[in-house]
Amino acid sequence: FRLCCAHFNHCIRGEAAREDENFVRAFCEKHALKLLSEKADVPAYANENSLSTETAARQLRYDFLERARIQSGMGFIATAHHLSDNAESILLHFFRGSGLNGLCGMKYCSGKIIHPLLEFEKKELVEYLLQNGEQFQTDETNFVPDTARNLLRLKIIPEIQNGINSSCEKVICRNAKLLNEDEKYLNGVAKEAYLNAKTENGVDTEK
C-alpha cells in the first residue's frame, strides 16, 4: 500500500511545535515518505468561534487531514490513536453521559478515518520504537493535569490501575467492544421495527 504523511502544526506549543514539525520532516526524508504539512493559529480560531482549544484543534486538524487525503489521492486517513487513548475517551464519554454510542469507543474504521493501532497500549508502542532504534517526540502538555483527559491519564486511571485492576484500560476497551455489538443489534432491531411499521402515510404506531 502507498503512504503519505500529514502533519498539522496547531501553533499552541511555540518552539516545541516547530521541533515536532522538524522531527516529522526529518523522519519522512529518512524513510523517503511524502509529507504534506500545514499550520493554523488554533487559539485564535477557538476565540473567534467561541470553542474550546481542544474542539478547535480537532476541527482544524481533521479539515486539513481530509484535504491532504484528497490531494495525495489516498483512500483513508490513518491516525495513531492507541488502546490507552480509547480507554480515556470511553471514560470521558461515560462521565459526560454520552449514552451507548459514546461508550462504544473509537471504531477501527469510521468513514475515511481508520485507527490501526487501537489494539496496542501506549507502553507497547514505546517499547517497539525503542527496540527498533526509532526516536519519537513527546508532547509535554500531556503531563499537565489541566484538562479532563489529562486528569484521567495522570491521576484517575493510574489510581484504578494501582488499586483495582492493573489492566483496566484493556478491560474498558473490551467492554466497549461488547457494547458495540449490543448497539449493532439494537440498531438492527429498531430498523426492522421501523420498516415493518412504515406505511405510505407515515408510521403505524400500533405495529
Predicted feature locations:
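Core alpha/beta nucleotide-donor-binding catalytic domains of modification enzymes
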Residues: F1-I157
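ATP/NTP-dependent adenylation/nucleotidyl-transfer catalytic domains that generate, transfer
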Residues: T147-K207
